[in-house]
Amino acid sequence: DSDGQLDWYLLDRPENQKLRKFFREINAFYKKTAALWEVDFDWAGFEWLVPDDNHNNVVVFLRRDKKGRDLMCAVNFSPNTYTNYRMGVPPHRRYVPVFNTDDPAYGGDGFGDSEAVMVEAVPSHGKECSAAIRIPTFGAVFLRGEGPFPRPRKKQQAKALEKT
């Protein structure tokens, strides 16, 4: 009814309070995270990591701010949870979780990475490095790339080859 009032009493329900908290916090997250809006109209601000995983109903992409800082977003459109979803990533030392739509504060189960995810020198999706993350059912996780990926020095590479 467009002429009536909103049903304000609905905010008394705990599940609606959690949903309200979710929208408050994701809007604040958007505003404070320049990678989500700063380079909106240029491909330099966006990169597909996993654009075509229709079997798992997952997409993963990066957003970048003007300083080149990466924010990875993995979205699961399926009723399955993924505990070890591997994808190729830019060479950072690690990816740190910064927002999870499955947080219990929003009515979720809290499934996702709570600690930093280390990047490994395991090729995947056309990249020389990859990471394995946890993605919740019908949810999204946002992770910030941190630090340069450690490259082995030439002496270390030579020693490693001698051992084999």
Which residue ranges define each predicted feature?
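Carbohydrate-interacting/catalytic domains
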Residues: 1-164
